[in-house]
Amino acid sequence: MLILVSPAKTLDFEQPPLTQVYSQPDFLTHSQELIQVCRQLTPSDISTLMKVSDKIAGLNAARFGQWQPGFSLDNAKQAIFAFRGDVYTGFDADSLSEDEIAQTQSQLRILSGLYGLLRPLDLIMPYRLEMGTALSNPKGKNLYEFWGDTLTQAVNEALAESGSDIIVNLASNEYFKAIKPKKLQGQLISPVFKDCKNGQYKVISFFAKRARGMMARYIITNKVNTLAELKAFNLAGYYYSEEQSSPTNPTFLREEQ
C-alpha cells in the first residue's frame, strides 16, 4: 500500500531528529521556482494571500529569504520529524523503530505545496505554502496549475516501486486536489472517520486528522497489504462500519467521547 498524507502548518525544528539517515526531495528545482516567486512578495502581500497575521507573514517572508538548496542536518530536518499537528500526533513518528522508519520511507508520501511530494526522510527547510494558495506563478494562477500532472506521475512511480496496487488517501481534500485520480495506476481508497456527536455520526476535523495519522501508522506497523486488513483498524475506539462504507470509502465510526 502507498499512503498519501498532508503536511502540517506546525513545524518543529528545535528537537533533534531520531535518525541521522536522510534523503533529498525529488522536486527541488520546482521548489526553487516557487521560492523565487515568493521572494517577490512583501509581508503585506503574504498576509493577504495566505490569510495570516502580520507576525506569521513576516516570519514566512524571512523563511523564503533564507531558503537555499544544499540541505543538510545542519540547516534542515527530515519531513516526518519536522511536521507537527494533528495528523502527525496520530502518526507519532518519534516512537517508530528503525525498521518501521525504513518501511515508512518506502510506503508513505507527503503532499506539499512547496516540495511537491516528499518521502518521510526527505530534508526540508521551514516554510509555509499551503496547496490551496492562489499563488500566481509562471505555470498558472495557483499551485494546482503549477504542479500539473507532476505529482500524479510521482505517485504512480512510488506505487510501482512499492509493489502494491492500492493507494490509501489520508490527505485532506485541499492537498489531494493536486492529484488526478483518473490518471492513477492503482486502486484508490479514501477512508472516512466519523465521530458520534449528539446522536449523529459526522466527520469532526480535529478527530479525523488524528485518525488519519493513526491509520497511516497502523498500516506500517501491522504490515497491512489488503483492504480486508485495513478494515480491521480499531485504534482509539474506531471500528469499521459496513453499512456506512462504499467500495472506495471505507468508513470508521467512534462513539461519543
Swiss-Prot record:
Which GO BP terms, alphabetically?
response to hydroperoxide
Q: Which organism is it from?
A: Shewanella baltica (strain OS185)
Protein name per its UniProtKB record: UPF0246 protein Shew185_1115
Offer a single GO CC term for the protein.
cytosol
Report the domain of life of the source organism.
Bacteria
What family does this chain come from, according to its entry? Belongs to the UPF0246 family.
User: NCBIfam families, per this entry?
Assistant: PRK02101.1-1, PRK02101.1-3
